């Protein structure tokens, strides 16, 4: 059912269209093969912890490419009420995944994952990490910049993985005021397209 779906495109641009379906469009760049399972449109629900307590949210993540040496990332979420219905817009982020020369110069690994994200809440985050397996990836914040109007946040650690049933699951921990990592977000998303 998801194999025929893709993201909408306009065919009047003189460059390859973005695709979230590996069966359509440009071939995935060879440098991104370790991230291939992420490509697609993912939808589902998760749980978050904020300053006003725990909450549930819905989410869509679009991971697409145009044949370049990076993946496009767009995540949109919305708060859910106690009945699981839409309540209000939630977190939104957009960015790029790519492989780069290892910033740590680790002799056992020559490449690191770089994830650059801009958040609608007014901050930009740079993560570095590695594949843990063929279908799981761990990333940690390396740098964070906040706009004048942006929310104050600490760094984060994210773990993504393709789990039983082919779903995408992730957990994010954020640094709290005491300097420790605490649970912040987790979700399980099913493939909607790709």
UniProtKB/Swiss-Prot annotation:
Q: Does the keyword Iron apply?
A: yes
The identity of this protein, by name, is Peroxynitrite isomerase 1
Q: How is the cofactor bound?
A: Binds 1 heme b group per subunit, that coordinates a highly solvent-exposed Fe(III) atom.
Q: How does it assemble?
A: Homodimer.
Which function does this protein serve?
A: Heme-binding protein able to scavenge peroxynitrite and to protect free L-tyrosine against peroxynitrite-mediated nitration, by acting as a peroxynitrite isomerase that converts peroxynitrite to nitrate. Therefore, this protein likely plays a role in peroxynitrite sensing and in the detoxification of reactive nitrogen and oxygen species (RNS and ROS, respectively). Is able to bind nitric oxide (NO) in vitro, but may act as a sensor of peroxynitrite levels in vivo.
Q: From which organism does this entry originate?
A: Mycobacterium ulcerans (strain Agy99)
Q: Which family does it belong to?
A: Belongs to the nitrobindin family.
Q: Where does heme b bind?
A: 157, 184
User: Which GO molecular function terms does the record list?
Assistant: heme binding; metal ion binding; peroxynitrite isomerase activity
**Per its Swiss-Prot or TrEMBL entry, what cofactor is needed?**
heme b
Q: Keyword check for Metal-binding, yes or no.
A: yes
CDD domains, alphabetized: lipocalin_heme-bd-THAP4-like (cd07828)
Q: Which Pfam families match?
A: THAP4_heme-bd
User: Span of the secretion signal?
Assistant: none
Domain topic, free-text comment: Forms a 10-stranded antiparallel beta-barrel structure able to accommodate a hydrophobic ligand in its interior. In fact, this fold hosts the heme group, which is located in a wide surface cleft.
Question: Keyword set for this entry?
Answer: Heme, Iron, Isomerase, Metal-binding
The annotated pathway is: Nitrogen metabolism
The protein's Enzyme Commission number? 5.99.-.-
GXWXGXG: where is this motif? 40-46
> What catalytic activity is recorded?
peroxynitrite = nitrate
Gene3D superfamilies recorded for this chain?
A: 2.40.128.20
């Amino acid at each position: 059912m998801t194999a025929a779906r893709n993201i909408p495109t306009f065919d009047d641009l003189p460059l390859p269209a973005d695709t979230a379906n590996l069966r359509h469009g440009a071939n995935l760049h060879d440098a991104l093969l370790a991230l291939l399972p992420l490509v697609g449109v993912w939808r589902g629900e998760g749980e978050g912890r904020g300053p006003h307590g725990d909450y549930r949210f819905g989410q869509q993540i679009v991971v697409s490419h145009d044949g370049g040496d990076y993946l496009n990332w767009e995540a949109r979420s919305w708060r859910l009420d106690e009945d699981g219905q839409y309540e209000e817009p939630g977190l939104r982020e957009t960015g790029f995944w790519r492989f780069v020369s290892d910033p740590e110069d680790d002799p056992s690994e020559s490449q690191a994952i770089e994830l650059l994200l801009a958040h609608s809440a007014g901050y930009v985050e740079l993560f570095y990490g590695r594949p843990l397996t063929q279908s799981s990836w761990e990333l940690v914040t390396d740098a964070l910049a906040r706009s004048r109007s942006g929310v104050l946040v600490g760094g984060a650690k994210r773990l993504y993985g393709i789990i039983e049933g082919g779903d995408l699951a992730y957990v994010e921990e954020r640094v709290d005021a005491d300097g420790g990592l605490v649970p912040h977000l987790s979700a399980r998303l099913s493939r909607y397209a790709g």
